[in-house]
């Protein structure tokens, strides 16, 4: 249930009845402080200005016309014309009852869209490193959130699986008489890549053969295609290990690499020329964009085909957007790519729109993100200044979590201990990233992310175990809670109202691609439950009705924390 949407609709109706235009905005928000009610409507001032009225006078008229019977216990006008709405506790109690038994915590079904989400995008013949972490886990949180709401989500792993490097790798594998590349681990391939590059730079005959293999590969030579396929398969098998460890939903079926669009590139260049968008310039094919200026203030030229006939990333990205709309039937396309690629994407999409490949009604959204930094504020590196491999980072996370958890649980069975350690270690790395606004850089700090207090995965996972332990101690389950829910205390009301705001939060996350909003919400819920737990007797409540009511609040808290963390890809545990 989306209380904000319900109240917005009611306040808008009252505003229109009071003389406001039909497109007026009620601007209903969750109140920042309890003294201002549960929700506040802030749209009166802007409407009053348009109507030439005193804001307070309009607010009084709106309140007269506002029908919140059974929903609000009190409506107040504050300051120059804010309308404060206090929810009726009986109404809140009924909605909690509904959320407890309804599918998806009572979140209303959406009109399903086909949404393509582009994320992760590692390179073939390279190990994944920390630079892939943000795209992978933020993108996956978006995918999980959209799927929870009922959208048809297409995961698109835009793997770097094409280019001149493949001629070099195929030639080097042949040189080493090791065509059976599938027997090699990716670490060997990484070494092969370095050795192949060194040989390519130093041996002209080898370089000629490598370049010849590029041409053969691009023209569909069977031997080269087989070798290329092996390189891709080995890489993706190793990446799948990382995805599984990260509890990320990507599989080999989601790979849509650069090579997928190869056949489209000549057609796109020809079409852009035919439409008068692309022209020849010094042998290359260029699209000049008035929207972007070069340093001389002239329209910027974007090359889509080099004079040697080769294509560029921009050409591939144009084809990619076209394919996602025309072939996949996308209603919305999201790209989780770092902020440094913003201008490149904007230029490609400007061409896409001008060419009519994707209509304006289909959003192309760059959900950009900042960098992961070390404590020194510089890009996160190894002590020797090298790139941190993702597998090494996850190994260290589990090792550090192991020390933390094993210390506190000396009697936990080995299998359960291993599962808890893994959930906490991997969860800590993911949550530390997801809990920060994606648009900013963030500092990677082991001590902060593994802390058992503050907005961290270990704290949230512990908060969940604390709630479910109530039911273990009580020896009850949901089916035994048969009495109606009543709310008698302020702390009960605060927790119940916040729990009912889950739909507002998940809708915001889906619209804006901002998982940190979910993290902040879950942290709030955990804090409100903690206060409720400390001040309101649950198992020893003064009556059976209040005992069951408080157990129901605890039950919805557990379900909300678990579901919210699941949309982030964070695993919960029953004990910690």
From Swiss-Prot:
Predominant subcellular localization, coarse grouping: cytoplasm
Enzyme class: ligase
Gene Ontology molecular function terms on file: arginine-tRNA ligase activity; ATP binding
Motif 'HIGH' region: chain residues: 122-132
Family: Belongs to the class-I aminoacyl-tRNA synthetase family.
Subunit field text: Monomer.
This protein's name: Arginine--tRNA ligase
Species this protein is from: Yersinia pseudotuberculosis serotype IB (strain PB1/+)
